[in-house]
């Protein structure tokens, strides 16, 4: 009998499978449709893949909300997906859910520029998918601003603040895509 470690399952397949398990009872916030949260997971991962990011970054994109929304620990992510994926997920997770929404968002933006590029890319892909969801909601499901506890102006300001911080980064097509997605929402 071999004493070697068992092979690790394919990273992306495993990331999507576990994201589906962990997000199983979660839905997007569309006002009139129950869209499974996996739609967002797939959207974020797809954006990262389309921009040529490494498999570990795409996997972290698929898992980007599991620490803050599902209570999954960094150690659990390390065990299943390795240190790099777990660290990227930690970088994009809000550290203290006991703070107010405003304080969490402010702190996240303040620390955006100190994060590794791959974590910044996951954040941008996450927000691109959120912006695209606002457009889809406006076209197919009704008033998109009903999805948010805070109104349109607060949300737009938050997205614009991220665009300003992203503009300080070296040029990348992902940043350009973020700007286009934001412009589409502002035009609604």
Regions found by a protein language model. Give the residues of each.
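Active-site helical microenvironments for divalent-metal-assisted chemistry
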Residues: 2-188
């Amino acid at each position: 009998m071999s004493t070697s470690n068992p092979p690790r399952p394919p990273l992306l397949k495993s990331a999507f499978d576990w994201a589906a398990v962990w997000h199983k009872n979660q839905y997007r916030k569309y006002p009139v449709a129950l869209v499974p949260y996996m739609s967002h997971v797939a959207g974020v991962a797809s954006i990262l893949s389309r921009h040529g990011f490494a498999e570990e970054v795409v996997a972290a994109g698929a898992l980007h909300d599991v620490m803050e929304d599902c209570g999954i620990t960094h150690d659990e992510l390390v065990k299943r997906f390795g240190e790099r994926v777990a660290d990227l997920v930690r970088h994009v997770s809000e550290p203290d859910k006991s703070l107010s929404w405003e304080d969490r968002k402010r702190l996240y933006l303040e620390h955006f520029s100190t994060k590794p590029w791959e974590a910044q890319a996951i954040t941008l892909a996450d927000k691109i998918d959120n912006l695209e969801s606002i457009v889809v909601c406006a076209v197919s499901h009704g008033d998109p601003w009903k999805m948010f506890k805070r109104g349109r102006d607060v949300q737009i300001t938050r997205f614009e603040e991220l665009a300003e911080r992203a503009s300080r980064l070296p040029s990348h097509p992902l940043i350009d895509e973020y700007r286009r997605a934001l412009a589409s929402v502002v035009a609604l």
